[in-house]
A protein has these predicted regions:
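Regulatory and interdomain segments flanking nucleotide-handling catalytic cores
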Residues: 1-280
């Protein structure tokens, strides 16, 4: 190959294109983000759960919901976030984030999550009054990093919801274990199943279901939903009712119902599914 700008440029673009992967817009797309070394980041924060960390994660999830084109559902729990992208009933054609280009999808979502978390963390620091706690928060500023992966779900919406069920179940199990480690030694809870830890907590008057906030038990799930709002008609100069869309969180009873499902096809019978603007 002759070293001219055009020759090298064309060759590099050819190789880049050969290695580029596109996600299939006709199948549900799952994007999963994790905080890199999340366990190290939370070291020194309040145990077993830190409200500042939960708040920053929630704000990060909401920003991803707003910025990732095609997202219909965003879930966060602990230090991870799951985004589902699929066809909705409004648009005839579904155009996913960056047209489904895999490398751009994972690099941009990781960058958005990293930037938004650190932005939220700084806001929390600025309003924190406890000087000792504030110094702990400051020591972690700009150290949050997220990685991202994206893939197509084989199957249909049930399989996509199953991936969500799996992550939510994992978060709730870990939550019980974390509360257990607050009141018992590692030796006392070692090798115990989740329900056994919950029973031990009940025996000493610390019921997981009552003592832990919803966001620390299950995380939170944001769904893009239509609602009737107000708009202005410039022709008639009147206020009119218009359909708008926004992101809404999920009450605890809906997440409990979702986690209680034991058969794949029954996921479509849940309130969470009813809220989705899903199109086959």
């Amino acid at each position: 190959m002759k070293l001219t700008w055009n020759e090298v440029s064309n060759e590099m673009k050819r190789m880049e294109k050969a290695e580029s992967t596109k996600l299939n817009p006709n199948k549900t797309i799952v994007i999963r983000l994790d905080m890199r070394s999340g366990g190290s980041f939370v070291r020194g924060l309040n145990k077993p759960f830190d409200d500042s960390f939960s708040e920053a994660m929630e704000k990060t999830a909401k920003e991803l919901a707003k910025q990732v084109q095609g997202a219909q559902l965003v879930y966060f729990g602990s230090d991870e976030i799951t985004i589902l992208l699929f066809k909705n009933k409004v648009k005839k054609e579904f155009t996913p984030f960056f047209e489904g280009k895999l490398q751009k999808t994972v690099s941009l979502t990781a960058a958005i999550a990293t930037a938004e978390f650190n932005k939220a963390w700084l806001e929390i620091i600025n309003r924190t009054e406890d000087s000792e706690y504030k110094e702990i928060l400051k020591s972690k500023l700009f150290y949050a990093r997220f990685d991202s992966r994206a893939f197509n779900i084989e199957g249909g919406i049930n399989e996509a919801l199953a991936s969500l069920w799996w992550r939510m179940k994992d978060v709730s199990r870990n939550s019980v274990q974390m509360l257990g480690r607050k009141y018992f030694s590692q030796k006392q809870v070692q090798n115990l199943k989740t329900y056994e830890v919950a029973n031990k907590l009940d025996e000493i008057g610390h019921k997981w279901d009552d003592e832990v906030r919803t966001v620390n038990k299950y995380g939170n799930l944001f769904i893009r939903e239509a609602y009737l709002g107000e708009g202005y008609n410039p022709k008639t100069k009147e206020t009119v009712k218009v359909t708008r869309h926004d992101w809404f969180g999920t009450p605890e009873e809906q997440m409990k119902e979702f986690l209680s499902v034991r058969e794949l096809e029954d996921l479509q019978k849940t309130k969470i599914f009813e809220r989705l603007d899903f199109k086959e």
